Regions:
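N-terminal amphipathic/basic-hydrophobic helices that include classical n-h-c signal peptides
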Residues: 1-7
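Surface-exposed, charge/polar-rich loops and edge strands
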Residues: 7-49, 53-180
């Protein structure tokens, strides 16, 4: 865990953002405003699905509590979130196990707030057909080809399998977040 004091750049991934309804975030610019007013620094977002980059000297758990509370109180959305240091995202991109023969836009990343190795990963030892899963140091890597008849490897399935909150992003979104 991070110690309070050093200002670090963090990436926050919101889980369950919807275009309308209970978990909608009407404008990402409003989210930037409320997080900035709360004292977070250099706050920015990427696409409407709930990707936030900010700087803070707070520990990750404190950031998580504050961001969750602010979104719930100011916007009304009760969203799960995963927060990682930007350096973790750099490692995730560098450690991508899928080579050039894989379609880049079909590679997905599953993130968990704690260490991925703390999950009961032995539960993944089943046949997923054309879909592939690789265990990384910081995440799970999924390859979900368009030709797969029924996509089993998705966030809902994995959350039920492990009994924890997870979130998924495409690898190209993770890479884009590093440039923001």
């Amino acid at each position: 865990m991070d110690k309070k004091g050093a200002i670090l750049e963090h990436i926050i991934l919101l889980r369950g953002v919807t275009p309308n309804g209970q978990n909608a975030i009407p404008k990402m610019s409003y989210l930037v405003d409320i997080l900035t007013e709360a004292g977070f620094q250099y706050v920015r977002t990427y696409i409407q699905s709930g990707n936030i980059i900010l700087e803070s000297d707070l520990a990750i758990e404190e950031i998580r509590e504050q961001v969750h509370t602010l979104i719930k109180e100011k916007i009304g959305a009760d969203l799960k979130l995963v927060i990682k240091n930007k350096s973790d995202f750099t490692k995730i991109v560098q450690e991508n196990p899928f080579g050039e023969h894989y379609l880049y836009d079909r590679i997905h990343i599953i993130l968990f707030q704690n260490a991925i190795q703390s999950l009961p990963l032995e539960k993944l030892n089943i046949d997923y057909g054309e879909e592939e899963i690789c265990i990384g140091n910081h995440c799970l890597y999924l390859y979900l080809p368009r030709t797969a008849k029924r996509k089993k490897l998705n966030t809902n399935y994995l959350e039920k399998l492990f009994g924890v909150d997870l979130t998924m992003r495409k690898l190209n979104v993770v890479e884009k977040l590093l440039t923001k």
